[in-house]
Every structure is written in C-alpha cells, then in structure tokens.
Amino acid sequence: MSYYGTVINDSAIIVVKAGEEIPAPAFLAVGADGKVATAGKNAIGIVLPGCDDKVTAGDDLDVQIKDIGAWTAGAAVAYGDELAVGAGGKAVKATAKSFIVGIALEEATKAGQRIAVQIVKAGYKPAE
C-alpha cells in the first residue's frame, strides 16, 4: 500500500539561480532566467530580503511567486494600480501591452519606496 502526501507545492516561495550579477536584488522582480526582469515583460516573482547583498551568477535567490509581498517602486504609484516591471526590475504602473505582475496595496509617492503588492500575474494589459 502506498501513501502519498501533497503532490502540489503550495509554497509562495521558490529558489531561482541568479542568471547574472545583481548588486542589490532584494525587492526587485526577476525573470525565470534569474536575471532582473525586463521592463514590461513577465516576471517569475520578487526577490525576498534574504538576498540584500550582491549576488553573482549561479547564486540562489529566494523568490516570492504569489500572494502578498513587498516590491520596490520605480515611480509613484497609487493604491490599487495594476503594476508592471519597470527599469531595474522595479514596480511601475502598468501601461498598454505591459505584463501585469501585481496590484499595489499601498501607494508610493516616489521611486525607491517599498510597497505591499498582491502578486497576480494577470497577463498583458490590453490597449484602451
């Protein structure tokens, strides 16, 4: 007789190998290749704060892929804004044809602030 546990990994966190040197990866979005996500494109998730220091290619990154977390804003955003990846893997308000990675759960009044976000991966924002 066989006994099976859960075969679905319901963790919000995965480990991704860094695909490049990243000076301060914490709270930045990364792609599946372990590199800082490209503006407007899909991101696998957001690097957690255990990775505050510089990482080199091949190092482990703890990446949050769902639920509520923190993301560094690349510009001012409002509570409830759909968020996409901006320059340097930071959160910006999603525009047409950019991939919606999350929803802002608090506002950022300037670039560099860390804000709470709901990671949703809602697909590409349609043109209005």
Language-model segments: what does each one mean?
Residues 1-128:
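Surface-exposed, low-hydrophobicity beta-strand/loop segments enriched in small/polar/acidic residues
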